[in-house]
Amino acid sequence: MSRKRNLWRGLTTLTASLLTVSVAAGPVVDSYRTDIDKFLGTKSSAMVTDSTDEDLYTYKSDYSSTTELLDSIEDLGERMSEEGTVLLKNENNALPLSKDETQKLSLLGFSSYYPVQGGDMGSSLSVNKGTDADTVDFVEALNAKGFGINEDLQKLYKSLEADFKTEVNMWGNIMEYYHITAPATDGVFASKEPSQEKMDSVDDKWKDSMDDYNVMLVTIGRSSTENGTYLPGVDGVDASQDLNQTDPLGLSDDERDLINAAVEAKENNGGKVIVMLNNANAMEIDEIKNNDGVDAIMEIGFPGGYGFYGVADILSGEANPSGHLTDTYAVTNANSPAAQNFGNYEWTNADPSVNINAEEVEAEDIYAGYKYYETRYADTVLGQGNADATVGSSTGKAWNYDDEVSYPFGYGLSYTTFEQTLKSVDVDLANRTVTAEVDVKNTGDVAGKDVVQLYTSVPYTDYDVENKVEKSAVQLLDYEKTDMIEPGESQTVTITADAQDMASWDSSCENEAGTTGNWILDNGTYYFTVGNGAHEAVNNVLAAQDQDVEGNKDNVQTWELGDFDSSSFAVTLNGTPVENQLQDADLNNWMEDTVTYLSRNDWEGTWPETYKDLTATDEMISTMADDYSDIEANGDPSSVTFGADNGMTLANMKGVEDITDERWSTLMDQLTLEECLIRTGLGGTSTKVIESITSPEAIQNDGPNGFNSYPLGQYANSDASTGDPCVIAEDDPNRDYKMGVMANETVIGQTFSKQLAAEWGKAVGNYSLWANTAIWWGVGTNLHRTPYNARNHEYFSEDAVLTAGQGAAIIKAGHDYGVLIAPKHLAFNDTEINRTGIAEFMTEQAARENELRGTQSCIEDANALAVMTTYNRVGCVTSNAHTGLLLNILHKEWGFKGLMSEDFIQDPAYTKIRMAVHNGVTMTCNTGDNTMAAVEAVWPYWSVENASQSEELLTDLKQTMLYQNYALANSNAMDGMSTSTHIEKLNTWYDNLITGLRIGFGVLTVLCAAMYLLGLKKKEQ
């Protein structure tokens, strides 16, 4: 009997322990419920709408099935590459290929078989096999379009597949790639192109196979990736390979040998050599351009999942290329002024514990990209500013444009020819417009589209020199693309540009606020012209100035401004007087007279030095280290209302566009303080439910090439009884489709088509409705400051106006479908090196005229209701905490009134949540459940007790929640909701499991205890 009693006692202890664990599991699960639900695909609550006669679905899809949706995306992907591929060289009309030639294709280069179709990270290609829109690579596209391909070469390259594999460690996850990869931020570029010797060892007859397949297409690839970079010059190359490569974006000997092998084969077989550039970072290709044996060069970017269909159409002539370069293709990238300060420049007194790691001084001022090359060229022609000095020269001799630029910004060829005539230009400062009319005539033999690029050249005066205001010799003012024009036919294109894009920021000029910092227009002659790129445009202007250049002075219009103008743009469209907001971004503000910024007044004397091995001052260290965690008591906290019972829900404000409507204040008064603290502190992956106002969870998706985070069906509605027109059945074959399939943003930029950009916004909007995900961190509006940032594929261009035009078109079109499209990253995400903490320094003029101008239009013109900030610092201040940038420029000057998230920082101290909320950041990227315990585990000071002391903080919290819920109310997150919608708790299978375990272990504990006690009683008897 003793053994039985011991058994029951042991079982009682065991079951009681398990009961305790199962009881304790409940609160633990509740703390991580949101993350658990996302991982398991379960739901712990639901928005339930009572029966109603009103139309619950404000936003409607253009498609009645997922098949139609995917077909439209596939079609757009093909057309994006048809119009976004840039034909750079086409000697003797080598392209398009004849029908016979399409059957004789020899593909050379491992990127022909293993192409780069998206970024390695952040915007990687979604491979959607087994759906209604399978993605294709180059070979698959050629086969589908009926091309004949050299199978011997294909077998050779496929046999080397193992040699192409690269393993990349992405934060502990080992990713395998079978295409060329970009180096990590601390790495160098290593060529993967097989050598001639390697190819001979596999098949020594491979060259003979090109006798019958005598159209040799050589693909040269360079990948891009988030959290990666190319370093300028030889420092960025794996020297151990000994491949005579002087820059990671230049050719290696293996690539040269491959091109030369194709040229040699051409001499024997009478064929053609086409070089295809599969890249997003502008490469050094002057030797290819000047190689007489190369007949054609095509820049295809990263075509995404369907773009190779378009590339094939261009080769065959089914499509006529109409793309133009979004970047200058320099002879030597490392010689640009911006490249003098692109690298790993750590502080001598770095402190990694608070992310004080590195700096980058943008000493080139406004002169990045074509603004440098074309301005310096103009000054050499004009004989001013020591422009022909040797600094920055690729030859070591006097600087000469032809030695520095292979292909200019905006350049692109067609299979036909066009003639553009600038008929008129009207400048209307009162309405802030510049209106131009351009006649475009197809003077060739093939139908095609043309791009009209309107450029301006503004006065550079003694005032500018004295006040350190820089002026580009030419700048893109706006652009449009024609319809398809038949041979001999014409089209008149009207361009209406923003006149503010002619203005220059003058940090010393007085303004309406009585301080300094203003937009100015100098008195003098303003020139307007059109051309096939910036170089043709500047030559037209120089010709009009009676300079001896190859320009067309008859294609120039002028406008005279009699008096200096500092009033036309002194007040923003939002009614806010402008003033300096970014003076602390200038390193000279912290370390006096440290930086000499480049000026066209003296190219030689102001040429940038490399600012490295700097020691941050005590003031800088203090500013960078401050986490703003001290929440001081202030004001009258009781004056800020929380928890009111006003009987409203967010559905009452559905579609209300007036943010000053007093009902918003009534609704916000219902919020609890806990809800505000939780929502601002934990915003990663979704906005989460707010019960007091029945605000829905809005799922976030990432990736500039499409919704890359989740499959189409993961959050889709599968309940047809709801009346949702975008229900996806559980057995729908496209549930697992992922949208990361579009060509990279550089290709979208190369289309120079606002219409195609708008179609992409439409596609995103439709997909959002079907996927039930309302937020897309998708439009990259940073600039290609240099070709070396390995994240350039996520951004359109080196030019702000092109960035603004394409970005705004996408966002505006997406609005029609209720998707919240966020431009990112605000601002100056110019490098991935040390990106969490790097201090970016620049002048306010450069900041406003270059990168910020690209985002400004997305807010002012497209009314973006979402924005993402950056990892980096602006000067010494984390972007989240920079009041000048976020509160004063973004909100007050531009009128932004939407939700805003930090980037994926997840570092509590670096996030600086107190200042972030003050500046309008509505949520961090941290994740956790809807509990204060989850918040305080990250930010112990972000508590009800501390917040309750500060009227300022309470006011800021309610303001950010207004921004966030205003955005949601004007989005498709509200589809299916009405004022009758309420939240109902749901038991998931794991809730039922825990409940079952509690009951089971409870019963077993009681039973075992009873048996044990019964045994004791028998013993006593």
Show where each model-derived region lies:
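Glycoside hydrolase catalytic-domain context in secreted enzymes
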Residues: 1-515, 522-529, 534, 579-1021
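Short beta-strand elements
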Residues: 536-579
